[in-house]
Amino acid sequence: MIEEKKELKKRRVLQMARFYGAAAFTLITMRLISRAIKVRKYVPSIFQQNYKLPPFSQRNEAMSALTYASAASIGTFSTLIFGFCWALDISTAREFVFKTREFMSLPQALETDTSMDEETSKLTKQLQDLLSSENNK
């Protein structure tokens, strides 16, 4: 009983750490995005034209925007997922499947159909052979 409580506490602390880590990543990313937007803002001085754009590289701007957008979406969705898992006490993907099936009122299947077609089994065997030959070197 005491061991179960310790295990549950350790599990909840791990879930909390994941959530707060994802939230911190999201906040840092959003702060970087805000700073990047402020830097790019063009404020002309008294004798400069209002419509003159500062020189910039389109490739660098596109890469920067893609990086910031990707980091923001990854951070937001990871915070959402880890918060959901923390609230519902989910630690593994298998638990997530069971809770989702329970939520959608689907029958629980302990054994899933893991049969493969012929092409998939050949590909799996080739990959396993390749990985085992790399490990032997």
From Swiss-Prot:
Keyword Membrane: yes
Segments crossing the lipid bilayer: 20-37, 66-88
Record key words, sorted: Membrane, Transmembrane, Transmembrane helix
InterPro entries referenced in this protein's UniProt entry, alphabetically: AIM11 (IPR038814)
GO cellular component terms, semicolon-separated: membrane; mitochondrion; peroxisome
Source superkingdom: Eukaryota
Disruption phenotype: Increases frequency of mitochondrial genome loss and leads to synthetic letality with a prohibitin complex subunit PHB1 deletant.
Its membrane topology: Multi-pass membrane protein
Keyword Membrane: yes
Compartments where located: Membrane
Similarity section: Belongs to the AIM11 family.
Note: Present with 1835 molecules/cell in log phase SD medium.
Protein's name in the database: Altered inheritance of mitochondria protein 11
Species whose genome carries this gene: Saccharomyces cerevisiae (strain ATCC 204508 / S288c)
Lineage: Eukaryota, Fungi, Dikarya, Ascomycota, Saccharomycotina
